[in-house]
Regions:
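Alpha-helical transmembrane segments and, especially, the helix-loop junctions at the ends
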Residues: 125-135, 152-186, 206-211, 339-352, ...
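Juxtamembrane and boundary regions of transmembrane helices in multi-pass small-molecule transporters
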Residues: 150, 189-232, 372-379, 383-432
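Membrane-embedded alpha-helical segments and adjacent helix-loop junctions characteristic
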Residues: 62-153, 291-292, 297-359
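Hydrophobic alpha-helical transmembrane segments in multi-pass integral membrane proteins
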Residues: 62-63, 175, 242-252, 298-316, ...
Length: 432
C-alpha cells in the first residue's frame, strides 16, 4: 500500500493549487527552452532561475531542494568524469581510428558498413555514454560513408537510435542509467548482468528494422575506399578505458562509488594530454559541460516540485503493483509515453521514486522505457535533439515524417523484446 500524501506545509507562500500550477508551468518552460535553446543559450540559463523560483515561492522547501541536490550530486560528478573521459579519448584519436576501421572493413558495401556502425555505436554508447556516440561518432560516420560513396542516412540514423537503445547496458551509458542505478540498489556488475540480455535483444531488433526500412539506401552502389595508411591505434586510450571498466566492477564490489573509477580514468588521460599539450585546463572544464550539469541539477529540483505538488498522486494510480511480465511491460510502456511527452530525463526523475519500492525489476523496466522510448520523437531525449543539430551542421536532412515512421516500426518491437529479456534475466539471475 502506498503512503498517503503528506498534509500541506505551513511554510508555503502559495496555496497547493498555485504551487502545482507554477511548478508545471516552470517545467514546461524549462523543457521548451532546452529543446529550442533560444539565442543559443545553454539549458541552464532558464533552468537555474526556475529552480530558484520554486524554492523562493515555497513550491518546494529549501530542505527538500537541498536533499535532492545531495542525492543528485554523486550522479552529476559521475557524469562529468565520463564526459571528460569521452572527449579525451577523441583527442587521443580513438574515434578517427574507429572510422578508419569501419571504412576499411566495410570494403565498399553499405550493408556491411551498417553492421560496423551498429557494433561501434553499441560499444561506444555502452562504455563512453550516449553523448560520445551522438557528438563524436556521428561526424565520423558521415565522413566514413562519404569516403566509400554510401548514402549516409541509414548509418547516421543508427547513431541516434543506438545512442538511446544501446545505452541500456551499464550505469555509465546514460544519465538516466546513473539515476536508475542509484535508485535500484544494485551493484555495478549485477546491473550489467541484468541488462545485458535486454541490451543485446533491443539492438538486434533495431538492426532488423534498419535493414528493412533502409533497404533502398543500403542497396545503392558504393565503392571501396582508397588505400590509405590507417591512423595509429590509440593504445593508451584503449587501455585506460579498459582499466576504467575494471575499476567500475572492483569499486562496486567493495562498496566504493564507481564515480571514483571514472575520475581516475579521466585523470590518467588528462595528465597525459596536458603533458603533451594536447589539451588545456580550460578545455577540460568545457569537456565537463558545467552548464549542462547545472541544468541537470536544476531540472531535478523543478521536477521534484512538480512531483511533490500532485504528480506523484496522479501517476501513483497508473503504476502497476508487482514485477511480473505484464507489470514490467506496463511500466516500460508508461515510461516510454511519459518520456515522449516531457522528455526522458524528467520522466525518469518522476517515475523512480514511485517504482523504487517495488524493487530493481520495476526500476529497470522504467529505464528500458525512458531509454528506448525517445526513438519515437525528436523531443524524447536531449541526445536526439543534439544529434539533429549535428546532422544539419553536416548538410544532412532529418525529415520528421521519416524519423517518426522509423520510430513507430522500431520502438514498440524493441521495447517489448527488451522487457521480455529483462523478465527472463530477473527470473534466472534474480533482482536482489
Amino acid at each position: 500500500m502506498r503512503a498517503a500524501c503528506p498534509p500541506p506545509r505551513k511554510d508555503r507562500i502559495l496555496n497547493p493549487q498555485l504551487a502545482e500550477t507554477l511548478s508545471v508551468a516552470l517545467l514546461v518552460l524549462v523543457l521548451a527552452c532546452a529543446v529550442i535553446r533560444p539565442f543559443g543559450w545553454p539549458e541552464a540559463v532558464v533552468a537555474v532561475p526556475a529552480a530558484a523560483l520554486v524554492i523562493a515561492t515555497g513550491a518546494l522547501s529549501f530542505d527538500d531542494a537541498l536533499a535532492e541536490a545531495e542525492r543528485l550530486g554523486p550522479v552529476i560528478g559521475f557524469l562529468a568524469a565520463v564526459l571528460v573521459l569521452a572527449q579525451l579519448c577523441d583527442d587521443e584519436g580513438l574515434f578517427q581510428a574507429c572510422g578508419a576501421w569501419m571504412g576499411r572493413t566495410a570494403a565498399g558495401r553499405p550493408r556491411r558498413l551498417l553492421v560496423q556502425v551498429f557494433l561501434a555505436a553499441s560499444v561506444i554508447t555502452a562504455v563512453l555514454s550516449l553523448d560520445a556516440t551522438v557528438v563524436l561518432l556521428t561526424p565520423v560516420v558521415f565522413a566514413t560513408a562519404a569516403r566509400i560513396g554510401a548514402r549516409p542516412k541509414p548509418h547516421v540514423y543508427a547513431c541516434t537510435h543506438l545512442s538511446n537503445t544501446a545505452s541500456l547496458l551499464l550505469p555509465v551509458s546514460n544519465l538516466t542509467n546513473l539515476l536508475a542505478f542509484t535508485a535500484s540498489g544494485l551493484s555495478f556488475t549485477r546491473f550489467a548482468a541484468l541488462m545485458a540480455l535486454p541490451w543485446a535483444a533491443a539492438i538486434g531488433v533495431e538492426y532488423l528494422v534498419f535493414r528493412r526500412f533502409f533497404a533502398t539506401d543500403l542497396d545503392a552502389g558504393a565503392q571501396a575506399p582508397a588505400s590509405v595508411e590507417p591512423p595509429p591505434l590509440p593504445l593508451f586510450a584503449l587501455v585506460t578505458v579498459g582499466c576504467t571498466l575494471v575499476g567500475f566492477v572492483l569499486t562496486s564490489a567493495v562498496g566504493i562509488d564507481p564515480a571514483w573509477a571514472a575520475l581516475a580514468g579521466a585523470l590518467a588521460l588528462a595528465v597525459r594530454a596536458l603533458i603533451r599539450r594536447r589539451t588545456t585546463p580550460l578545455a577540460l572544464v568545457r569537456a565537463a559541460s558545467v552548464p549542462f550539469l547545472a541544468f541537470v541539477l536544476a531540472l531535478g529540483i523543478v521536477v521534484l516540485a512538480v512531483v511533490d505538488n500532485g504528480l506523484d498522486d496522479a501517476l501513483g494510480h497508473l503504476i502497476p503493483e508487482g514485477t511480473g511480465l505484464a507489470e514490467l511491460l506496463a511500466l516500460a510502456g508508461l515510461a516510454a509515453v511519459l518520456a515522449n511527452v516531457i522528455n526522458n530525463l524528467p520522466a525518469v526523475l518522476v517515475l523512480l521514486p514511485l517504482t523504487a519500492p517495488s524493487g530493481p525489476g520495476a526500476v529497470l523496466a522504467v529505464l528500458i522505457g525512458v531509454n528506448i522510448g525517445p526513438n519515437l520523437t525528436y523531443a524524447g531525449s536531449l541526445a536526439t535533439l543534439l544529434w539533429r543539430r549535428i546532422v544539419h551542421a553536416h548538410d544532412g536532412e532529418v525529415e520528421l515524417k521519416e524519423f517518426t515512421r522509423l520510430g513507430v516500426y522500431a520502438v514498440p518491437a524493441s521495447l517489448a523484446v527488451a522487457v521480455l529479456a529483462l523478465w527472463l534475466s530477473l527470473t534466472v539471475i534474480g533482482g536482489g
